Design a protein with these regions (language model features):
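Active-site nucleotide/adenylate-binding loops and adjacent lid/helix of ATP-dependent enzymes
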Residues: 4-5, 90, 103-187, 241-257
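Active-site "cap" helix and flanking loop/linker of ATP-utilizing ligase/carboxylase catalytic domains
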Residues: 251-274, 291-364
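ATP-binding N-terminal substructure of ATP-dependent carboxylate-amine bond-forming enzymes
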Residues: 1-96
């Protein structure tokens, strides 16, 4: 089969690397891709949200399967675009439809889903510009630190954790009235602060069967010793040392199963990867957020541990035969470290040449 991967990051490079090893993948394309993917596949210079141009290339290259890396095209309805176009109806898309993608596209939607299905998460309330005064009153009744989250997509920057009440009120006003995060902060979710250690859980589902991938933990802060501002992720490890068999069973029983059952009860079709951001509070798991795709940089430590042919698993998703597959992964550890330009995550230079890479490196550099 011919496969198109949509995206341009390290996550998509890892998908490309893994699918290049697949016995069922004939030709591999990435849109728009990057310098790394160009070594393994054909890059197509198309933006991830340019659905019409993507359609043209899918038909021209006789692509059978599309794997969506980032969240933007999913929230914008790329799966629905393929599903509703007679020319593309035969092309399978690994990634949920627009309705399900709201689990990441709207934090309020996700929180309502969790509460409705008894999935453990932080207490919360949602506010709009019209209910700013109620938002102030809600903050006054909370114990600091105060957690403010832009409802929509904000490129991973829409979460503020603030110690001071007056500062929290000021930021709430900025978000709701001044639009400090643009459209994303037209609604703001204020959450109870959860004190614990975070981890990431990954599921692949065809809407009926599902497989649980190795769990991972990413490290977001820019500086040594977990200091400095948050980033998209400076590194990740898998497996996670503090996930015991007992704790893993709690995740499956209290979070994974109720989530998948919730999709069925709410009549939400879900096909693709589901990334559940968790926090371990004491000995209990709670959900911080849902993401409707694989994580970056977590993909870079999860897929190298996977012993299965990824192409076979994704074909099973397309054919809704995932129940027939069993997952197998190496009993080893994987670590990834992210190299970034100076100044990141603020203003930084782009387009610099990366030198000194070993193409035959056993460490996958």
């Amino acid at each position: 089969m011919n496969v198109l991967i949509i995206g341009s990051g390290g996550r998509e490079h890892t998908f490309c690397w893994k699918l290049a090893q697949s016995e069922v993948c004939d030709h591999l394309f990435v849109a728009p891709g990057n310098a790394g993917t160009s070594r393994l596949a054909t890059n197509l210079p198309i933006a991830v949200n340019d659905f019409k141009k993507l359609k043209k290339e899918v038909l021209f290259h006789n692509i059978n399967l599309v794997v969506v890396g980032p969240e933007d095209p999913l929230v914008n309805g790329i799966h629905d675009f393929f599903l509703n176009d007679p020319d593309l109806a035969h092309v399978a898309v690994v990634g949920p439809q627009k309705q399900a993608a709201q689990l990441e596209g709207s934090k309020d939607f996700a929180k309502e889903f969790m509460i409705r299905h008894g999935i453990p998460t932080a207490k919360y309330a949602t506010f709009t510009p019209k209910t700013l005064a109620e938002g102030y009153a809600y903050l006054e009744n909370q114990i600091p630190p105060y957690v403010l989250k832009a409802d929509g997509l904000a490129a991973g920057k829409g979460v503020l954790i603030i110690e001071d009440l007056q500062e929290a009120k000021k930021e709430l006003k900025k978000m709701l009235i001044e639009g400090s995060f643009g459209e994303a902060s037209k609604q703001v979710v204020i959450e109870e602060f959860l004190d614990g250690i975070e981890l990431s859980c990954f599921i692949l589902t065809d809407g009926d069967g599902h497989l649980v991938l190795p769990m991972a933990k990413d490290y977001k802060r820019i500086g040594e010793g977990d200091q400095g501002p948050n980033t998209g992720g400076m590194g990740a490890v898998s497996p996670v040392s503090f996930v015991t068999p007992v704790f893993e069973k709690k995740i499956k029983d209290k979070i994974i199963e109720p989530t998948l059952e919730g999709f069925k009860k709410d009549n939400i079709p879900y096909q693709g990867f589901l990334f559940i951001g968790l926090i371990k509070v004491g000995e209990e798991p709670k959900v911080i957020e849902y993401n409707v795709r694989m994580g970056d940089p977590e993909t870079q430590v999860v897929l190298p541990l996977l012993l299965n042919d990824l192409g076979v698993l994704l074909s099973a998703v397309a054919n809704k035969t995932l129940k027939e597959e069993k997952i197998d992964f190496a009993k080893k550890a994987a670590v990834t470290v992210v190299a970034v330009s100076g100044g990141y995550p603020a203003d930084y230079e782009k387009g610099k040449v990366i030198e000194g890479l070993c193409t035959d490196s056993k460490e996958n550099i």
